Regions:
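Outer membrane beta-barrel translocator domains of Type V secretion systems
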Residues: 553-717, 822, 827
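Extracellular beta-strand/beta-solenoid scaffold signature
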Residues: 25-54, 65, 69-84, 88-90, ...
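Membrane-embedded beta-strand positions of outer-membrane beta-barrel proteins
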Residues: 29, 40, 384, 594-598, ...
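Outer-envelope beta-barrel architecture signal
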Residues: 319, 353, 380, 590-594, ...
C-alpha cells in the first residue's frame, strides 16, 4: 500500500504531517541503553528523545519528526543531568544536511535541557510547545546549552501556547551558564495563549544569569512576539538579537530588563511595537544599534535604578520613537527600587529620525499617589533626581514635544529641531547646546523654556506670538538661569504674526524685551514680513544694549518691482539693435534686403537680487525709397528672471518701422518707431501675479562719419528716444492689489563709434561707447491690502554708460554676417552682457 504525506506551512517552517498508521517510538539514552544513535526515514515519527546519566542520543535522517502526545512525558526532547551524574547528557537532532525538522509536544515543553546539551540542525526547523518551545535550566558549572540551527539553516520557528494550566514561552532560559543559541536566515519566536489562559506568554524569558543569542550577520529576518517580547532579569542575564530586520511585537511590553541584565540589538532595521516599548530597571542595560522604530501608546522607554538605555550612539542610524520617555519608581518609602535616576541616551541622527512624545519623572507622593514631575530638581530626597538623560538631534533630526518635559542635556545641531507642541507648557533643560539648529515654541504666551546652561551658535528660536493692538505682543518665555557660553548668538523669530499686524514697531519690540532672557548672548529678534510691509528687526548685544527697531522693505514687492523694471529696461534697450541694422546700411551701400538677427543677454536689478536673462529673435526687410532706406522688423523676446524669493517669465512682441539716410558729406540721420506688447508672470514668496503692458517708442539719431587713413573711420552721434508704457492693474494670489501707473522715458544719448575697414571691402571691426540719460524714467504704482498700502516706485532715470565691440564680414556680394558684445553700467538696471549675431542676404 502506497503511503501519502502532506506538507503544512507553520510560520516560517514546514510541518510534516504523518499518516496516523505510522507507529511512533521513543529514543532513550541512559545507563541501561547507553549512547543511542538512530537513523530515521522520511515519514517516520519519534514520540520523544531523552538522554540522561551522561549519555548521548543522536537522531539523523533526511527529514526528522518528533511529536510527543502523552501528558506523562511533558516534553518531546529532553537532555537531563541528575545530581549523581558525572556530567551533562546530550541530544543531537539532525545535521546541516537534514531537510525538515519538526519537534512538537501536545503537553509541556517541546525541548528541555536541564544542566545538559541539546543541538538541533536542519534546513527548516519548527519547534512547537504548549508551555515552552525551548527550555534551558542550569545551576551547575558545566551549564545547559541549546543550539538550534546553523548559518545554513533557512528558517527556524519556535512557538508556544499558554493554556489554563501553564505559562507560555518561546524561549525560557534560567540559571548561570544556561545558554541558548539560535541561528538561521529567518527566525521567528512567538508565544500566544488560548482564550481561557490567564498566565504569562512571553517570547523570550532569560533569568538568573542565562544567556540567549539569536541570529547572526547572515540572518535576514528575526521576529519575536508575545504578551512580553522579551523579559531579561536577575544576575547578569543577557539576550542578544542580530539580523538585518528585527521585529518585536508585544501585547504589553516589548523589551523588559532588570537586575543587572543586558539586551543588545544589532541590525539594519528594528521595529518594536508595544504599549510599553522598553523597560530598563535596576542596573540593567539596553543597547540598540540599528535603524529603529518604537511605537508605543503608553511609554516608549521607562527607566530607573541606575539602568541604561543607549540608542544609536554611533550616530549612523535613524531613530523613530512614538511615545514618552519616563523615569519611574513605584516603590514607597522603606522599599527597594526607589532610585529614579538612570542613563538614557537617544540619538536622532538624520532627517528621518523623529521622537514624538514627552519626558517626565513619576513616583509616589506621601499619600501614595503617583505624580508626574518635570522639574530638574524634583524635591524628593528619597527618590533622588534624574541626572543621566541625554538627547542629541543632528542633521535634520526632530523632537516633537507633546507635553511638559525635562532633559538633563540636549545637543541640537546641523538643521535639527525641537518642536514644542501647543499643549506643552514647560520644558526644563540643564544643559542646552544649539548649533545651526532651531527650537520652535508653538504654544504662545503660556509656554516656557528654562535652561540652566546655554551654548548657541547660529541658533534659531521661533516663538508663536499674537497681538491685539499692533503695539503689544504676547508670546512665551525663554530664559537661561545660570550661564551662557561666550560668543553665543540667538536669532528669535516671532511667528503667528507679521509686520502687517504691527502699528508701532518700536513699541512692539519693547513689549517683548523680557521674553527672551539670555544674558551674554547676541540676540536678534525678528517679526517676519507680511504681504506689504517688510520684516521688523531689533538686536540686543551681549552687553544688554538694544538697537532701535528697523522695518525693511518688503522683499516680495521689491522683487515684483525689480522684475517689472528689468523687463521695461530690456524692451527699452532693444532700440539699439534695430539701430545696429541702420549702422550696417551706412557701412554697406546697396545692403538693403531681408535680414535676421538673434541677440540675448543678462541684466540685473541689484536692489532686489533680480537677474533677467533674455533671448530675442528679430527679422526684417528694407528697401530704398529715393535717397532713403526704409524697412520694417518684427521681434520676439523671451525672458526668465531669477529672484532670491521666486522666479518670473516675460515675453515681448515688437513691431518696428525705421528709415535711414546717408549724405555725401558724411552726415547721417535715422528714425525708428516701435510698438510692443509685454507680458509678465511672476512669483515672489506667496505672491503670484500676471500683467500685460502696451509699449510705444519713437526716436532718432543724427551723426557724422569721418573717414581717415583710407580705411579708418569715426562716427560721433546724438540720439533722442521717447517711450511710453501703459500700466496694468492686477490682484496677486495673496490678495495684494497692484496698481501700475503709466511709464514715460525720455532718453538722450551721446556716443561715438570708431573702427576700420578690412581690405577689399571684406568687412570691418569697430568699438563704440555712449553716455545716456533718462530725463523721466519713473516707474510708479501702489500695492494695497486690508487698509495698508505701499509704494511700487522705482526710478529708472539718471545716467548710465554703454560700451561694446563688434565686427562685420561680407562673405559674398549677397551674404553678410555681423556680431557684437555690449555692456551697460551705472543705471538702476545694469546689463552684464548683450550678444548679437545677424545675417543679411540679398536675393
Amino acid at each position: 500500500m502506497k503511503r501519502k504525506y502532506s506538507l503544512t506551512l507553520l510560520g516560517s517552517a514546514i510541518v510534516l504531517a504523518l499518516p496516523l498508521s505510522t507507529q511512533a517510538e521513543s529514543i532513550l539514552a541512559n545507563d541501561m541503553y547507553g549512547d543511542v544513535e538512530k537513523a530515521v526515514k522520511s515519514g517516520e515519527v519519534i514520540e520523544k528523545v531523552f538522554a540522561t546519566q551522561n549519555h548521548i542520543a543522536t537522531v539523523t535522517g533526511p527529514n526528522i519528526s518528533v511529536h510527543n502526545t502523552t501528558k506523562v512525558s511533558q516534553y518531546a526532547i529532553q537532555a537531563n543531568r541528575l545530581a549523581t551524574d558525572n556530567g551533562p547528557s546530550k541530544v543531537i537532532i539532525g545535521d546541516p544536511s537534514t531537510g525538515i525538522v519538526n519537534i512538537k509536544t501536545d503537553f509541556g515543553n517541546a525541548i528541555q535541557s536541564n544542566h545538559s546539551n541539546i543541538e538541533v540542525y536542519g534546513k527548516k526547523i519548527s519547534v512547537e510547545g504548549i508551555s515552552t518551545a525551548l527550555r534551558s535550566y542550569s545551576n551547575y558549572d558545566e551549564g545547559s546549552n541549546i543550539i538550534i540551527g546553523s548559518d545554513s539553516t533557512e528558517s527556524v520557528s519556535l512557538s508556544s501556547v499558554s493554556d489554563v494550566e501553564t505559562d507560555g514561552y518561546g524561549i525560557y532560559a534560567e540559571g548561570i551558564n544556561s545558554k541558548v543559541n539560535v541561528l538561521g536566515k529567518t527566525i521567528k519566536v512567538s508565544a500566544s495563549k488560548t482564550g481561557e489562559a490567564q498566565g504569562a506568554y512571553e517570547g523570550i524569558d532569560a533569568i538568573n544569569g542565562a544567556r540567549v543569542s539569536i541570529g547572526s550577520q547572515n540572518t535576514s529576518s528575526l521576529s519575536v512576539d508575545g504578551s512580553v517580547g522579551m523579559y531579561v532579569g536577575e544576575a547578569d542575564s543577557s539576550v542578544s538579537l542580530r539580523a538585518k530586520n528585527i521585529n518585536i511585537d508585544a501585547v504589553e511590553v516589548g523589551v523588559w530588563t532588570q537586575k543587572a541584565a543586558q539586551v543588545s540589538i544589532l541590525g539594519e532595521q528594528t521595529n518594536i511595537s508595544a504599549p510599553q516599548g522598553i523597560l530598563a530597571y535596576s542596573n540593567s542595560k539596553v543597547t540598540i544599534d540599528s535603524d529603529l522604530i518604537v511605537s508605543s501608546e503608553e511609554a516608549a522607554i521607562v527607566a530607573r535604578g541606575h539602568s541604561s538605555v543607549t540608542i544609536n550612539s554611533r550616530n549612523a542610524k535613524s531613530t523613530v520613537i512614538n511615545g514618552d520617555i519616563v523615569f519611574m519608581s513605584t516603590s514607597p518609602d522603606g522599599k527597594s527600587g526607589n532610585v529614579i535616576d538612570a542613563d538614557v541616551s537617544v540619538n536622532l541622527n538624520n532627517e528621518n529620525s523623529i521622537w514624538t512624545g514627552r519626558s517626565y519623572q513619576t513616583f509616589k507622593n506621601n499619600s501614595g499617589e503617583m505624580i508626574e514631575v518635570v522639574d530638574l530638581d524634583n524635591g524628593n530626597d528619597y527618590y533622588g533626581n534624574v541626572t543621566g538623560f541625554y538627547l542629541k538631534a543632528s542633521n535634520g533630526g526632530t523632537w516633537n514635544v507633546t507635553g511638559d518635559s525635562f532633559v538633563n542635556d540636549i545637543e541640537v545641531a546641523d538643521g535639527a529641531s525641537i518642536n514644542m507642541h501647543s499643549d506643552t507648557d514647560v520644558l526644563n533643560v540643564d544643559g542646552l547646546v544649539v548649533n545651526n539648529a532651531s527650537v520652535n515654541m508653538q504654544g504662545g504666551e503660556n509656554q516656557k523654556v528654562s535652561v540652566n546652561k546655554l551654548a548657541a551658535r547660529s541658533a534659531s528660536l521661533n516663538m508663536k506670538a499674537s497681538t491685539k493692538d499692533g503695539k503689544s505682543i504676547q508670546t512665551g518665555q525663554f530664559e537661561v538661569l545660570e550661564s551662557v557660553e561666550e560668543g553665543s548668538d540667538l536669532g528669535v523669530t516671532l511667528t503667528g504674526i507679521t509686520s502687517d499686524d504691527i502699528q508701532d514697531a518700536q513699541a512692539a519690540m519693547d513689549s517683548v524685551k523680557n521674553t527672551v532672557v539670555v544674558k551674554g548672548a547676541t540676540i536678534e529678534k525678528t517679526i517676519v514680513e507680511g504681504d506689504l510691509r517688510g520684516e521688523i528687526t531689533e538686536t540686543t548685544a551681549a552687553d544688554g544694549s538694544r538697537s532701535i527697531a528697523k522695518t525693511a522693505e518688503n522683499t516680495k514687492l521689491l522683487s515684483m518691482k525689480g522684475v517689472n523694471a528689468a523687463a521695461l529696461v530690456a524692451w527699452r534697450d532693444e532700440v539699439a539693435y534695430t539701430n545696429q541694422r541702420m549702422e550696417f546700411l551706412r557701412d554697406n551701400s546697396h545692403a538693403y534686403g531681408a535680414w535676421a538677427q538673434v541677440y540675448g543677454g543678462e541684466s540685473a536689478y541689484d536692489d532686489a537680487s533680480v537677474d533677467l536673462t533674455t533671448t530675442t529673435v528679430q527679422v526684417g526687410a528694407d528697401a530704398t525709397i529715393g535717397d532713403w532706406v526704409a524697412g520694417a522688423a518684427f521681434s520676439y523676446m523671451s525672458g526668465d528672471a531669477d529672484m532670491s524669493n521666486g522666479q518670473a517669465d516675460t515675453d515681448a512682441y515688437t513691431l518696428s518701422l525705421y528709415a535711414s539716410r546717408m549724405f555725401d558729406s558724411g552726415l547721417f540721420v535715422n528714425g525708428l518707431a516701435r510698438y510692443g506688447r509685454l507680458s509678465t508672470d511672476a512669483t515672489a514668496g506667496n505672491m503670484d501675479g500676471s500683467y500685460d503692458n502696451n509699449a510705444f517708442s519713437v526716436g532718432g539719431n543724427v551723426g557724422y562719419r569721418i573717414t581717415f587713413a583710407e580705411q579708418a573711420f569715426v562716427e560721433p552721434m546724438f540720439g533722442l528716444q521717447y517711450a511710453y508704457v501703459t500700466g496694468d492693474d492686477y490682484k496677486a494670489s495673496n490678495g495684494v492689489k497692484v496698481e501700475q501707473d503709466d511709464f514715460d522715458a525720455l532718453i538722450a544719448s551721446l556716443g561715438v563709434r570708431t573702427g576700420f575697414d578690412f581690405a577689399k571691402d571684406a568687412g570691418k571691426l569697430y568699438a563704440r561707447a555712449s553716455v545716456n540719460h533718462d530725463f523721466l524714467g519713473e516707474v510708479d504704482g501702489k500695492a494695497s491690502k486690508g487698509g495698508l498700502a505701499e509704494s511700487m516706485y522705482v526710478d529708472l532715470g539718471g545716467t548710465w554708460f554703454t560700451y561694446g565691440v563688434g565686427t562685420q564680414f561680407n562673405i559674398t556680394d549677397n551674404l553678410s554676417v555681423w556680431g557684437n558684445v555690449d555692456r551697460t553700467t551705472g543705471g538702476e538696471v545694469s546689463t552684464r552682457y548683450m550678444m548679437n549675431a545677424g545675417l543679411r542676404y540679398v536675393f
